[in-house]
């Protein structure tokens, strides 16, 4: 979340990011990349779904999203080299991803420098979004669902071509209308603490404004 906010706000600090990725390399799984959560999460309060995976494997969710924003910023680091190997290996065998895993996959494919390989990989895994029922095409769908804008937030997004213009416009209308009285946006998954809710609402508000602006909804 932190790296993405630095990117969204155009407050990228190369020294700060280098320190963060240096640390990330010290806790990386044996194969490279980033775990979903570190075992140390158990030492304090945390979301109930923050459960360390047995064997400390790399996570598509975390590895892909971190690698994606680093590539978008032209960042280089040995951690990123190994993370890239992990992502290509996982994407080659991807068959039934979760929606959250696809966030990582798409972030990586959107920005990885090998564009020919990324385009070919997306042609295979992109349709899994629809085939796997990972996207709620109805803007009014309730529960913990993923909007097309979650996977294709910008006109330049790789996944934008999977959805009709009418679907995108309907979801933009819904996003604009979901702004709360305090000016912020709320998430659609369980809120387990006031602190976490404040953190996520802040992030999603910045993201919602970014998406609306990029799609001509000033």
Regions found by a protein language model. Give the residues of each.
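Preference for long, amphipathic alpha-helical scaffolds in soluble/luminal domains
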Residues: 1-218
């Amino acid at each position: 979340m932190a790296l993405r906010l630095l990117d969204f706000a155009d407050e990228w600090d190369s020294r700060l990011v280098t320190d963060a990725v240096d640390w990330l390399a010290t806790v990386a799984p044996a194969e490279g990349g980033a775990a979903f959560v570190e075992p140390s999460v158990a030492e304090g309060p945390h979301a109930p779904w923050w459960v360390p995976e047995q064997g400390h494997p790399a996570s598509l969710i975390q590895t892909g999203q971190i690698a994606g924003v680093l590539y978008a910023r032209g960042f280089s680091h040995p951690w990123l080299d190994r993370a890239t190997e992990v992502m290509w290996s996982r994407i080659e065998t991807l068959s039934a991803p979760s929606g959250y895993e696809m966030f990582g996959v798409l972030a990586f494919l959107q920005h990885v420098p090998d564009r020919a390989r990324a385009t070919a990989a997306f042609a295979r895994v992109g349709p899994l979004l629809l085939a796997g029922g990972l996207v709620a095409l109805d803007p009014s769908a309730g529960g913990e669902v993923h909007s097309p804008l979650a996977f294709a937030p910008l006109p330049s997004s790789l996944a934008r071509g999977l959805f009709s213009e009418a679907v995108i416009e309907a979801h933009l209308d819904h996003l604009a209308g979901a702004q709360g009285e305090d000016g912020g946006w709320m998430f659609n998954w369980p809120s387990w603490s006031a602190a976490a809710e404040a953190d996520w609402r802040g992030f999603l508000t910045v993201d919602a404004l970014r998406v609306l602006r990029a799609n001509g909804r000033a």
